[in-house]
Amino acid sequence: MDCVPLEKWLNTTNMSDIINTLNIIDCIPLEIWLRITNMSGEINLLLTCTKLFGLFEYVNINAPINECEIAIKSIIKYNEISVLKFIINNKFSFRLKYTYFGHMYPPRLMHLSCEKGNLQIVKLLHSIKNNIIQLDSYLIQAVKSKSINVVEYIFNNFGNICQEKINLALLESCRDSWLDGIKYLISKGADINANKCIAFIEAIKTGDLEIIKYFVAQGANYNDHATSIWYWTLHPIKSRVIKYMMSINTQINLDDVYIFHPIIQQEIIELIKYAVSKGYRFDMEKTVHFARILNRSSIIEYLESIINDER
């Protein structure tokens, strides 16, 4: 076989070809595999099937942690339960010879399994007697995988997960625009207004209008943090979100420099008209001054007509 990095091989090779390649193992004496591994420095293949994994303690090289993780992620991705059980059973003292392998056992394995959304392996790891795994510690990884089954398993098998961890999981779901996860976490008590409404603000950053509307329907206190909300609505400009926030009467302070500048620069006249219609006071003279500098004629004409009417 040509020597290529395992990650590249796994990403560019059909699963049937991978299986055919691994079947070659039965035709080659283990002593030869051991010699090939020592000479080439490529230990990845030893971590992809039970028969070769047993050679690991006899190899005279050290593999970087990231190479081990590539192999472990492959095992989890392709649901190689028998190989994983071999690792878990710890049939040789790899902790003594290769201390870095301790990172794979078993908390790190649970971390990677939740990250990959593999419920079967999560259940296997959780079933280990006298394990030191605290399921709630892996809630964020499960959320990142967007695996509702793994998230539900964690809630159903841990007990009372602290409010802070649930809120952090909600925050991650908003960053990833995962509506199903958001709905589930809110049903489990996630506080949508915690930490200055940060979860809602993360939803604003993504511009996902469906999620934004869901938060509002669930009682998000958007007017308590209107400045931050408008900032992220305007950086960058999200036209559909702007229209929606106006439709629900979101307060706006046009004297705030971080709101004022993008409105003038992008000539968002509808927001200025909105502020005037709602009676929100702001320095119109200053707004006209900066509009002249940037030659924003529609803003100049509109505000000058308002100023003249007030005189």
Curated annotation (Swiss-Prot):
Q: Gene3D superfamilies given for it?
A: Ankyrin repeat-containing domain
- Give yes or no: UniProt keyword NAD: no
Keywords, alphabetical? ANK repeat, Repeat
Which SMART domains does the UniProt record give? ANK
Q: Which domain of life is it from?
A: Viruses
| One Pfam family recorded for the sequence | Ank_2
Which InterPro entries has this protein been placed in?
Answer: Ankyrin_rpt, Ankyrin_rpt-contain_sf
Query: Which ranges does the UniProt record give for the ANK repeats?
Result: 67-96, 105-134, 136-163, 165-194, 195-224
Q: What is this protein called?
A: Putative ankyrin repeat protein R825
